[in-house]
Amino acid sequence: MRISTYSDLHLEFGSGWMLPPAVNGDVMILAGDIVTLSDYEPLDQILRKWRKPVLYVTGNHEYYTRRPMSEEDNRFKAWLKAKHPHVRLLLDEEVSIGGVNFFGGTMWTDFNRADLRAMETAGSQMNDYRLIYNPDETPFTPADSIALHKNFASRLLNWFGKNLSGPRVVISHNAPVINPNSKYRGGPLTPAFNSLDMVGIIETHQPVLWVYGHTHECDDQTIGQTRIISNQPVYPGLGGVECKDFDEAGLPVEVGV
């Protein structure tokens, strides 16, 4: 199976970015921060040109609408079902396609096991905690992020515990591990997009591939037999492509069955 991957296209900023004709594969992964869920039109233009299976996980920017996340999820699923049934939205869920097993979700951060300083800094500085709302219409908080992270991790481990034939691929928006060359390594907000517990999970369970986004840095590294990649242009309409290693063709990966 040939998999093309993208994240952080940020089409909400009017970049007009479109899939290049050279993109070729069996499955496309969209690992979040593609659009804000108040306007589907930029995404619609891309999905009309790609009729093969798409696996989508939401990022934080999808929810910058000041409406409850659960409400946005339901509206988005209904829109996809009506207009693009070849797209599967994964909300801490699994799906198998062509013998390959996928698990995906946003994977909100656990703030490196509830680092209080990072939680306070993020809560006061990041748009997530002003623009995103919980199902009960209260503002999203770092504590809510930790609770959602625990749900992701629990379901992921349950999936790894299943007796499935075929390779396994994990999709998240937040990073499962810091890029060794990251300019953000050791920064005060690094725990706001990285969770320490995922490294041990990767080392133990060894999925063949983990695809993520969010960091505004491209990545291609391995932990044991697991390849970890991120292919993100980041704000392509605002002064060019931020990640110079961005592959317009989707950084295609072959996953054997």
PLM regions and their residue ranges:
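Active-site-proximal loop/helix segment associated with metal-binding centers of metalloenzymes
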Residues: 103-169, 174-185
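Active-site environment of divalent metal-dependent phosphoester hydrolases
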Residues: 10-17, 35-41, 61-71, 94-96, ...
